[in-house]
């Protein structure tokens, strides 16, 4: 059961022992209603970790994936989980643990959204909520349960969360969970699961305590390392424009259009409604733009992406859902009309401006309310976002 390949791990980094990739969702043999959910969610093609990790999980291997936040790892295990569960069996078949309530709820939303066309229930089992409500929800036998270690452990001990149909156990952000002192509860949960349960572990770092979990509880795991440098801010000039009020962003954008010759740009907004609103406003001012968000069906989105890739449409306005699917070489400029609601998405939005070794420019519209988020982003990525200079046109 112990895995020999992990004894001498350099500086908390695992070595990949699996290099097969599947570069389209269509090639993964997913259930039709799951594939429909994947596309409806806004994915176009799998990210690096999705190309590598979804298939070994579906095939039933224990999998260790070392990947940073924001690489698409939540969807990696959500898609694999949904593929493996039997929707006719009303019992928990997959248990997903996360270090915080917020992350658990976020994962639940992703599972529910991607599983939208499947008859599958997913319950979030987290502290700070009513134990009675939890017990009631678990008695209905949701096929997927996602939760924090304390509450999940409690529910298994009360025999409300039954483990006899459990096929899969996912630990997300394992390093975080162990550093928060959940080690004992996690070990206890392992002991209460059927011996045959498949284990999938995701972690940004591989400290000793995480390696111990992998050697104790995983059988001959597939190891996948998605290096940090697959997403980088290097070569991307990042600026901000201070905008006094939200209402002034539109004029700021129009002014920018006047100063800068845009070969191709993506403008990100935080909501679908804002995308539609901005598209209407810019069209009314005679700017040619296309828009794309998760409310559109796949066929519509394909047409828009094709136009954008071919260059017949030069400006694309989109939501975060699509940040991961836009892979366009010519994008020289990314504008965050809204700063992303979570900092992990920042690199997904602007990292693409500099892909394929191209240089790019990112411009963030920042109101007084956004300053804190901008500082957080700077800290998180150890980067600097400077005030936009007058000669910005020369940089693009």
UniProtKB/Swiss-Prot annotation:
<feature type="short sequence motif" description="DEAD box">
    <location>
        <begin position="172"/>
        <end position="175"/>
    </location>
</feature>
<comment type="similarity">
    <text>Belongs to the DEAD box helicase family. eIF4A subfamily.</text>
</comment>
<dbReference type="GO" id="GO:0010494">
    <property type="term" value="C:cytoplasmic stress granule"/>
</dbReference>
<keyword id="KW-0378">Hydrolase</keyword>
<feature type="short sequence motif" description="Q motif">
    <location>
        <begin position="23"/>
        <end position="51"/>
    </location>
</feature>
<keyword id="KW-0067">ATP-binding</keyword>
<dbReference type="Pfam" id="PF00271">
    <property type="entry name" value="Helicase_C"/>
</dbReference>
<dbReference type="InterPro" id="IPR001650">
    <property type="entry name" value="Helicase_C-like"/>
</dbReference>
<dbReference type="InterPro" id="IPR044728">
    <property type="entry name" value="EIF4A_DEADc"/>
</dbReference>
<dbReference type="GO" id="GO:0003723">
    <property type="term" value="F:RNA binding"/>
</dbReference>
<keyword id="KW-0694">RNA-binding</keyword>
<dbReference type="InterPro" id="IPR014001">
    <property type="entry name" value="Helicase_ATP-bd"/>
</dbReference>
<comment type="function">
    <text>ATP-dependent RNA helicase which is a subunit of the eIF4F complex involved in cap recognition and is required for mRNA binding to ribosome. In the current model of translation initiation, eIF4A unwinds RNA secondary structures in the 5'-UTR of mRNAs which is necessary to allow efficient binding of the small ribosomal subunit, and subsequent scanning for the initiator codon.</text>
</comment>
<feature type="domain" description="Helicase ATP-binding">
    <location>
        <begin position="54"/>
        <end position="224"/>
    </location>
</feature>
<dbReference type="GO" id="GO:0002183">
    <property type="term" value="P:cytoplasmic translational initiation"/>
</dbReference>
<dbReference type="GO" id="GO:0005524">
    <property type="term" value="F:ATP binding"/>
</dbReference>
<comment type="subunit">
    <text>Component of the eIF4F complex, which composition varies with external and internal environmental conditions. It is composed of at least eIF4A, eIF4E and eIF4G.</text>
</comment>
<dbReference type="InterPro" id="IPR014014">
    <property type="entry name" value="RNA_helicase_DEAD_Q_motif"/>
</dbReference>
<keyword id="KW-0963">Cytoplasm</keyword>
<dbReference type="GO" id="GO:0003724">
    <property type="term" value="F:RNA helicase activity"/>
</dbReference>
<feature type="binding site">
    <location>
        <begin position="67"/>
        <end position="74"/>
    </location>
    <ligand>
        <name>ATP</name>
    </ligand>
</feature>
<feature type="domain" description="Helicase C-terminal">
    <location>
        <begin position="235"/>
        <end position="396"/>
    </location>
</feature>
<feature type="region of interest" description="Disordered">
    <location>
        <begin position="1"/>
        <end position="20"/>
    </location>
</feature>
<dbReference type="Pfam" id="PF00270">
    <property type="entry name" value="DEAD"/>
</dbReference>
<protein>
    <recommendedName>
        <fullName>ATP-dependent RNA helicase eIF4A</fullName>
        <ecNumber>3.6.4.13</ecNumber>
    </recommendedName>
</protein>
<dbReference type="InterPro" id="IPR011545">
    <property type="entry name" value="DEAD/DEAH_box_helicase_dom"/>
</dbReference>
<dbReference type="InterPro" id="IPR000629">
    <property type="entry name" value="RNA-helicase_DEAD-box_CS"/>
</dbReference>
<keyword id="KW-0347">Helicase</keyword>
<keyword id="KW-0648">Protein biosynthesis</keyword>
<keyword id="KW-0547">Nucleotide-binding</keyword>
<dbReference type="InterPro" id="IPR027417">
    <property type="entry name" value="P-loop_NTPase"/>
</dbReference>
<keyword id="KW-0396">Initiation factor</keyword>
<dbReference type="GO" id="GO:0016887">
    <property type="term" value="F:ATP hydrolysis activity"/>
</dbReference>
<dbReference type="GO" id="GO:0003743">
    <property type="term" value="F:translation initiation factor activity"/>
</dbReference>
